[in-house]
């Protein structure tokens, strides 16, 4: 048996000393700490001083709850504790942030007279945009409930307000101008081009999500190398085709705010894709295909 000293990462005060064996997992140690601190295990983060960061007082969080504590503890048998604050499930956050656009976007479409002080018949492009925007978020909610398997059960509750503000606010920004009485419809060829790109993006995005789901057995946090179709070319094709989808939406609506939303989303997805690409290379090493790009086939 080994006594593990757990110290607050911020105050450096000792939280307590906990007995562990060579078979004690991180999750089991969290339960011991939870019993003493009366905090839920989802709020507890355990870390060790970073061996790679040059920043002072930098820490590296321990791995999965299934990892052995002995794998991480150094010679001084000390771990550092941080309270992550109130948590909320990933799926609930996603449902809330995706449900908002389904209510916000139609407000500008159906209540034009109340919002703009005047009304006009909706063009074909405006009708198509309403359907596309709504179907995108209906699809996202469906995937959250029935498709995605999350490696982490919860996230800080602050993310609920941050994420909802982004999606709901951007929806209002896009819908206000697309549904404006003075809106000028794009040439019909451009509308169909944008619609075609949107459909291709949405269909392949769903296919990518099904492929990712099939990589991870239910209730598991196991990671495997994604393979097949677009995954042979880029690490995150689900982001690639979602960007394509929003480009299509921007072409069919031809509004500046649609392009701004598409670019904002693309920038964020690029950041996520770079992070995932690096994690794949770090985790799988030489097994990971060297020719596979991050987001754009053969280029980036």
From Swiss-Prot:
Q: Look up and give the organism this protein is from.
A: Dictyostelium discoideum
Keywords annotated in UniProt: Endoplasmic reticulum, Fatty acid biosynthesis, Fatty acid metabolism, Glycoprotein, Lipid biosynthesis, Lipid metabolism, Membrane, NADP, Oxidoreductase, Steroid biosynthesis, Transmembrane, Transmembrane helix
- Does this entry carry the keyword Transmembrane? yes
State the family named in the UniProt similarity comment for this chain: Belongs to the steroid 5-alpha reductase family.
Q: Name one GO biological process term.
A: steroid biosynthetic process
Q: Which GO terms describe its molecular function?
A: oxidoreductase activity; very-long-chain enoyl-CoA reductase activity
Q: Which reaction does it catalyse?
A: a very-long-chain 2,3-saturated fatty acyl-CoA + NADP(+) = a very-long-chain (2E)-enoyl-CoA + NADPH + H(+)
Physiological role: Catalyzes the last of the four reactions of the long-chain fatty acids elongation cycle. This endoplasmic reticulum-bound enzymatic process, allows the addition of 2 carbons to the chain of long- and very long-chain fatty acids/VLCFAs per cycle. This enzyme reduces the trans-2,3-enoyl-CoA fatty acid intermediate to an acyl-CoA that can be further elongated by entering a new cycle of elongation. Thereby, it participates in the production of VLCFAs of different chain lengths that are involved in multiple biological processes as precursors of membrane lipids and lipid mediators.
Give EC number(s), comma-separated.
1.3.1.93
Q: Which residues are glycosylated?
A: 163, 238
Can you tell which superkingdom this protein's organism belongs to? Eukaryota
**What's the protein here called?**
Very-long-chain enoyl-CoA reductase
- Give the stretches traversing the membrane: 91-111, 191-211, 243-263
- Its gene name is gpsn2
**Locations listed in the record:** Endoplasmic reticulum membrane
Q: What is its main location?
A: endoplasmic reticulum
